[in-house]
Amino acid sequence: MKQAFLQLHLAILLASCSGIFGNLISLDPVLITGYRMLLASVMLLLLLVIKYGRIIVDKSNRHILWLGVLLAFHWVFFYGSIKYANVSVGVVCFCLSGFFTALISPWINRKRISWVELLLSSLTLAGISLIFHFDASFRIGIVLGIVSSLLFAFYATLNERVNQSGQVVKTTALQMVGGTFAIGLLLPFYHVSKSSLSLLPSWEDLVF
């Protein structure tokens, strides 16, 4: 239980830092996600090549690539929530992933629902509902944040099975590659709908 709480606090801290940088970067949420996953893909693949000399990918790794797609869309909605609202709203909505995980994990893993976890995580839902009703300017950001937390709950639940293989670096690298390809395929259509969209980061964006 203590380890779970430590992991939760660490995840919230990382989400806060990521949210702050995402808010400071002038790029669109889709581009932020694309560049982030591309950079992570290159670094992790290089690490694997240096360590093992080669990377073996077979048909059994396809589901790992699809998990990367799921993670990519989670980040797009997370950064979208921050852009449309603010960092605080984005992070609070991210905390809602605990509520969704308490529902999704028993369903996927065929286990009993932990009513204690569900009750504790529902407190976040109560806080979000207060913000939603009292500040209409944040509603789009809250909706995007809720979708983001739902996607992350699915990702976290499915990723538990994948990480049991023990090849964490390879798994993460393949997920980053899958997410990068997904954003790459989406970007041409997205760019057409937003012709004024800047594709290249500024020097200030590179700092963050």
Regions found by a protein language model. Name each.
Residues 3-7, 31-46, 117-123, 163-208:
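Hydrophobic alpha-helical transmembrane segments of multi-pass integral membrane proteins
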Residues 26, 84, 110-112, 165:
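Helix-loop interface residues and adjacent transmembrane-helix termini in multi-pass membrane transporters
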Residues 31, 38-42, 70, 79-110, ...:
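Specific alpha-helical transmembrane segments that line the substrate/conduction pathway
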Residues 44, 48, 96, 103, ...:
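Hydrophobic transmembrane alpha-helices of multi-pass small-molecule transport proteins
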Residues 51-89, 94, 130:
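Specific transmembrane alpha-helical segments of multi-pass solute transporters/efflux pumps
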Residues 79-85, 131-141, 193, 197-198:
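Membrane-interface helix caps and helix-loop-helix hairpins in membrane proteins
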